[in-house]
């Protein structure tokens, strides 16, 4: 496969989605076609699974069911959208991917890293990002952002106790430390302008010949 896979990761409220929208005009100047997408979702059936997973009324979804729903959505998304784009040499930039399952289900839900790594491998046949930008932020600051700016859009995961969100962040920090070659950590507590500038700097430095 000769495409490039970039994933964006971080706790809820870190600003990934906002940053992706901001950087798109600049990265669309890359020599290759850029395909922005997200998980869970990205294709029709995976977006339907997303609705089920994130609906606050679906309180009967337990941790293992949740993990498998994310994996099913990932498989659909990868087969239908990500792999064809990567095979065509495009740049796929995905808002959340395998590391979200490790951080949220592995650490946050206490299912453990081993089982989540295994299921991620099963769902993706071992596909890994070339680069993962990890947007790091203190849990309380991130939750405050969500409640302040998009309280009308909170989903089932956003509504989890702060304790789970803290475990998710600690999980991310452990994952990032384990694979320094793949991850770049970005301080997401800065102003949006600075976070966007840092993100573009990393991308332009890493993919210098692509711009
Ligand atoms: N650097 C920033 N400073 C202050 N507010 C920000 C910053 N970045 C994003 N925000 C705001 O914080 C809120 C959360 O941002 P956003 O939805 O992009 O985060 P996210 O990481 O995609 O979260 P989630 O994973 O929960 O969807 C939004 O209302 C956004 O406007
Ligand atoms: C892919 C994936 C996501 N999650 C969680 C993380 C967020 O709380 C939601 C997705 O909402 P967003 O607004 O698109 O960030 O789902 C998860 O727990 N496990 C995963 O694999």
From Swiss-Prot:
Domain of life: Bacteria
GO molecular function: ATP binding; dTMP kinase activity
Annotated CDD domains: TMPK (cd01672)
Keywords: ATP-binding, Kinase, Nucleotide biosynthesis, Nucleotide-binding, Transferase
InterPro entries in the record: P-loop_NTPase (IPR027417), Thymidylate_kin-like_dom (IPR039430), Thymidylate_kin_CS (IPR018095), Thymidylate_kinase (IPR018094)
UniProt entry tagged with the keyword ATP-binding: yes
Protein name per Swiss-Prot or TrEMBL: Thymidylate kinase
């Amino acid at each position: 496969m000769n495409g490039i896979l970039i994933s964006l990761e971080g706790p809820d409220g870190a600003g990934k989605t906002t940053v992706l929208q901001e950087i798109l005009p600049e990265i669309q100047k890359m020599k290759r076609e850029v395909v922005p997408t997200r998980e869970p979702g990205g294709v029709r059936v995976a977006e339907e699974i997303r609705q089920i997973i994130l609906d606050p009324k679906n309180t009967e979804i337990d941790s293992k069911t949740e993990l498998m729903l994310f994996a099913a959505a990932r498989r659909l998304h990868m087969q239908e959208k990500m792999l064809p784009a990567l095979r065509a040499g495009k740049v796929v930039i995905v808002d959340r991917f395998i590391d979200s399952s490790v951080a949220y289900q592995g650490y946050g839900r206490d299912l453990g890293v081993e089982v989540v790594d295994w299921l991620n491998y099963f769902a993706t046949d071992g596909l890994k990002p070339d680069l993962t930008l990890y947007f790091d932020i203190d849990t309380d600051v991130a939750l405050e952002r969500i409640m302040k700016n998009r309280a009308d859009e909170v989903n089932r995961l956003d509504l989890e106790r702060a304790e789970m969100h803290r475990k998710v962040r600690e999980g991310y920090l452990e994952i990032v430390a384990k694979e320094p070659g793949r991850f770049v950590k970005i301080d997401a507590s800065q102003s949006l302008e600075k976070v966007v500038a840092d993100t573009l700097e990393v991308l332009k430095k890493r993919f210098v010949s692509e711009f």
